[in-house]
Regions:
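N-terminal capping/linker segments that flank leucine-rich repeat
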Residues: 1-186, 388-390, 402-434
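Acidic, Ala/Val/Gly-enriched low-complexity intrinsically disordered segments
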Residues: 10-13, 29-31, 35-37, 210, ...
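Intrinsic disorder/low-complexity segments
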Residues: 11-14, 30-32, 36-40, 213, ...
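Serine residues within intrinsically disordered or low-complexity segments
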Residues: 11-22, 216, 224, 246, ...
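Structural signature of tandem-repeat unit edges
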Residues: 45-48, 67-74, 90-94, 150-159, ...
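Short beta-strand elements of solenoid repeat domains
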Residues: 168, 191-195, 217-221, 243-247, ...
Length: 434
């Protein structure tokens, strides 16, 4: 059975559904304390810092976006006030009609140049707060499908440091435009548009990415996005592109012609489940420093050709599921692949059901310990060159040739291949004959 999601992370494969990120999740508000309740939220006991509770209190304040709400003063102790870094002492009565389909957003200023930092001992919780026509910055971008906001204009007119999780799971937003972008020192954009499943248009022409180091999951699960032009991106300092476009299942065109990947070390699941992508040009990619490519093209079921002849894989150790479930793939060019440091090729070509020829005579597999299901489901494969396969370190090889043609297996048996591979083929042929 073919998997629906790529299950490969930086540390290997998992049998559970793919969930590469674990940002702060919604939970219920903690029980009311003896200090009482203000604005529907429990107060913190005097002199104590309830780390996780402070998060829920803050979220509760801004959560109800569709009704008239009076936000009253909440008496935080000094320690909590210092940690939250926002002024919550003077709120006015606020009424929101919520009929507008376009909202202009602006980050909330604080001395750290961040949106919010709840507690440094926990994962930093970033969310932008936007202005209404009264300039009261009290609403979050945690928007769901039943909310009416569909278009957002962003104005960044002062320095901020991180956009991590900025629009995380904003499922209702269809269009985002960065109208003004202050030249800044932003270093993080991981999960920035993660889960924006209604997003069809995004204008990044004013984007400044000069100092960004992390773009992991940046467009993950933007399942309605059809086109993406990142021609102006400066990626000189980026080291992590893990799952950057994972789950962009409607994406048919992506321009990466100016991508600088010189410093990238992680490309795992980068194009995972880009199932509508029919062509991808990575001829300018520099992969000299990449160490993991696991699941990089997993589930790219519309790709028919992949040319990676320019790829330098000298430092790559993990190729788990790299081309798994590329079910339309007919041609793949890996002539320059150096696999001398690779230890895991599990699922590497799993489910490549249209692939007819595969020449791997340049593969150095002396350090590979797992080849399980490597060619499983390659049901159209009629030519496979494994003449230089060194299986001396292989510990796992179960399912390696499952669902391959009998003719291919018989042909391989006649070739000069390792005794481990011959034994594996003999066992499989005996099963097929019985």
């Amino acid at each position: 059975m073919e998997p629906k999601r790529c299950t490969f992370g930086a540390s290997g494969a998992s049998s559970s559904s793919f969930s590469p990120f674990s940002p702060l999740t919604e939970q219920g508000v903690p029980a009311t304390t003896s200090a009482g309740v203000v604005a529907g939220c429990p107060l913190l006991p005097k002199g104590q810092l309830k780390k996780i509770r402070s998060t829920f209190i803050l979220k509760k304040i801004f959560w109800h976006l569709k009704e008239k709400k009076k936000l009253e003063t909440i008496r935080y102790n000094k320690s909590t006030q210092k940690r939250i870094n926002i002024n919550i002492n003077h709120y006015k009565e606020y009424t929101e009609k919520y009929s507008s389909i376009e909202i202009e957003m602006k980050p909330m200023e604080n001395k750290y140049g961040r949106f919010i930092n709840i507690n440094k001992e926990y994962e930093e919780y970033y969310h932008i707060y936007y202005n209404d026509n009264k300039k009261e910055q009290i609403k979050s971008t945690s928007l769901n499908k039943n909310d009416k906001v569909s278009k957002i204009n962003i104005i960044i007119d002062y320095q901020v440091k991180s956009f991590n999780n900025l629009f995380y799971n904003c499922k209702c937003i269809e269009s985002i435009c960065f109208k003004k972008f202050y030249r800044n020192n932003i270093t993080g954009m991981s999960n920035m548009f993660y889960g924006c499943s209604s997003l069809t248009n995004i204008d990044l022409s004013n984007f400044n990415t000069d100092n960004v180091t992390d773009m992991s999951g940046m467009f993950c699960d933007c399942s309605s996005l059809k086109e993406l032009n990142l021609n102006n991106f400066n990626n000189n300092n980026v080291t992590n592109m893990r799952c950057m476009f994972s789950g962009c299942s409607s994406l048919t065109n992506i321009n990466l012609s100016n991508f600088n990947t010189n410093n990238v070390t992680n490309m795992s699941c980068m194009f995972n489940e880009c199932s509508s992508l029919t062509n991808i040009d990575l001829s300018n990619f520099n992969t000299d420093n990449v160490t993991t490519m696991s699941g990089m093209f997993c589930g790219c079921s519309s790709l028919t050709n992949i040319d990676l002849s320019n790829f330098n894989t000298d430092n790559v150790t993990n190729m788990i599921g790299m081309f798994s479930v590329c079910s339309s793939l007919k041609n793949i060019y890996l002539s320059n692949f150096d696999t001398s440091n690779v230890t895991n090729m599990y699922w590497m070509f799993y489910g490549c059901s249209s692939l007819e020829k595969l020449n791997l005579n340049n593969f150095n597999t002396s350090n590979v310990i797992d080849m399980s299901d490597m060619f499983n489901g390659c049901s159209s494969l009629i030519y496979l060159d494994l003449s230089n396969f060194d299986t001396s370190s292989v510990f796992l090889s179960n399912g390696m040739f499952d669902m391959c043609q009998t003719a291919l297996l018989k042909n391989l048996k006649k070739k000069k291949i390792s005794s481990k591979l011959k034994n594996l083929i003999n066992i499989l042929l005996n099963k097929l004959n019985n």
